[in-house]
Amino acid sequence: MAMGLFRVCLVVVTAIINHPLLFPRENATVPENEEEIIRKMQAHQEKLQLEQLRLEEEVARLAAEKEALEQVAEEGRQQNETRVAWDLWSTLCMILFLMIEVWRQDHQEGPSPECLGGEEDELPGLGGAPLQGLTLPNKATLGHFYERCIRGATADAARTREFLEGFVDDLLEALRSLCNRDTDMEVEDFIGVDSMYENWQVDRPLLCHLFVPFTPPEPYRFHPELWCSGRSVPLDRQGYGQIKVVRADGDTLSCICGKTKLGEDMLCLLHGRNSMAPPCGDMENLLCATDSLYLDTMQVMKWFQTALTRAWKGIAHKYEFDLAFGQLDSPGSLKIKFRSGKFMPFNLIPVIQCDDSDLYFVSHLPREPSEGTPASSTDWLLSFAVYERHFLRTTLKALPEGACHLSCLQIASFLLSKQSRLTGPSGLSSYHLKTALLHLLLLRQAADWKAGQLDARLHELLCFLEKSLLQKKLHHFFIGNRKVPEAMGLPEAVLRAEPLNLFRPFVLQRSLYRKTLDSFYEMLKNAPALISEYSLHVPSDQPTPKS
C-alpha cells in the first residue's frame, strides 16, 4: 500500500517539474509565424548555393593546375628519356667505333706484298707503298758498305771491352774495400749489357753499359713490387716498379733483444749481433725515401757517385789517365781521359735484381727524347737487357752461319745515328730498332736470315718501323708476349701483363711524333747517298789505346 502511494507521488512530482510553463527552455522559443521561418531558410539556402559554386570553381581551378603540372612533368620525363636514349646511343656508337678500331689494329697485322714479298702472314705490313716508294741500295752495295765501314767496329769493341772490364773490376774491388759490410750496401760483380755485348755497336765513340747489382746489409733485403703485380698504376707508369726494404729474418723487434740493451758478454740465440735493427732514424742509411720504406733513386745516385769517387781516389795512382763523371744526371756516367786527349766513355749503372730472375731495376738510363721521367723518386725502371742478350745468343744458334740479323740492326743503327747528328735527336732510338728486330726474329724462319738476304731483311725491318710509327704502336718484346720461348725463363707475371706500347708517348706528344716521322723519312731519303759515300770512305776513328 505504502509502495503504491510512493509511486503515485513520484509521477505527480515528475509531471510538475517537466511542465514547460514552470521551467521554460532557452531554445524553445516558437517563431511568431511560418513566413519568417521560410524566409530565413531560403536565405540560408542561397548562401549554401553560393558557397557550393565557389567551392566548385576552386576545385576546377585546382584540377586545371594539377593537369598543367602533370603535363609539364610528362614533357620533362619525355625529354629526359630522349636525352638518356641519345646518350646511350652515343655511348654505344663510341664503344662500337673503339671495337672497330681495336679489330682493325689487331687484324690488319698481315703483311703487305710490297714489304714482305707475300711471306709470313703474321708479319706486319703497310697498306700503301712501303717507305714512301724510296729504294735502298742493292745487295752488292750494302755488302760492300758493311765490310768497309761497319765490320771493323767489332774488333774495336772487343778491345774496348777487355780494357774496361779489367779497369771496372779494379774499381769495384776498391769500392768494396771501403765499405762496411754491417752497415753499407754490398756491391756485386758487374754485368755487361746492350750493344757492346750483343755485337752490334757501330756508333762512335764506343760506349759500354755495365750493370752493377747491389744488396742491402744484413738482416735486410729488397722486396720488388712490379706494376703488374695487382697494383693499379697509370699507363705512363707501366714498366716501372718500387723496391721495399724489408727484414730478411722477420721482425726482431718483438724479441727482447730488440727492446733491451744486452751486455757485451750476452748474445741473443735467435738474432746475432749483426741482426740487430738500427734506429728508425737510420733508414736513410738504407737509401730509402724520407719517412718511407721504399728505395729512393736519388739517394742511390748520391751514394753511388760518392762511393765511386772514394774508390777512384784509392787507385788513381796506379793509372796514367783521369776519371771523371760524364753526365751529372746519370749516377754512373764515367769518362776516362787519356793524356793524348782521347777519351773513353762508359756507364756503370747501379741495379737491383728482381727476385731470382734476370730482370733488373735500374735507377737511371741514358735519356731518350720519348722516354718519360719517373713521377716519383721511388719509381724504378725494369730492364730486360740481360734477357735480350740471352735471346740474341740463343737465336744465333738456330740461324744459318753468317746470319744477317745483326748486320741489319747495325746498318739501321748507323743510319739513325747519322740522321740524329744531322737534324738532332728524335723520338726514335736504337732500342726501338732492336725491339723491331727481336719481333722479326721471332716471326721469321731461320732460313730467311741468310747472309745473302741482307737487303731484303733490312727493307723488311724499315717497313716494320714505318708501320709501327704510322700506327703509333710498338709493343715491348717481352712484356705480355706469350710467343717468347719458355726456355727464356721470364716471370709469369711479366708474360701475363698487358703489352707495353713503347710508342705511347707519340700519342700524347704530337710535335715529337711529327718530328720523329719527318726524321725517319729523311733518313730513308738520305740512306742511298750516305751508304755510297761511306762505302768509298772509311772513317778515321782509330782503336782507343789501352793503358
From Swiss-Prot:
GO terms for biological process: extrinsic apoptotic signaling pathway via death domain receptors; negative regulation of extrinsic apoptotic signaling pathway via death domain receptors. The keyword Acyltransferase does not apply. Residues 16-83 are extracellular. Residues 1-15 form the signal peptide. Residues 32-82 form a coiled coil. This is Inositol 1,4,5-trisphosphate receptor-interacting protein. The chain crosses the membrane at residues 84-100. Keywords: Cell membrane, Coiled coil, Glycoprotein, Membrane, Nucleus, Phosphoprotein, Signal, Transmembrane, Transmembrane helix. One of its GO terms (molecular function) is protein kinase inhibitor activity. The modification Phosphoserine is found at S547. Glycans are attached at N27, N80. Pfam families: Mab-21_C. Gene3D superfamilies: 1.10.1410.40. It comes from Homo sapiens. The gene is ITPRIP. GO terms for cellular component: membrane; nuclear outer membrane; plasma membrane. Enhances Ca(2+)-mediated inhibition of inositol 1,4,5-triphosphate receptor (ITPR) Ca(2+) release. Residues 101-547 are cytoplasmic. Residues 109-129 are annotated as: Disordered. Belongs to the ITPRIP family.
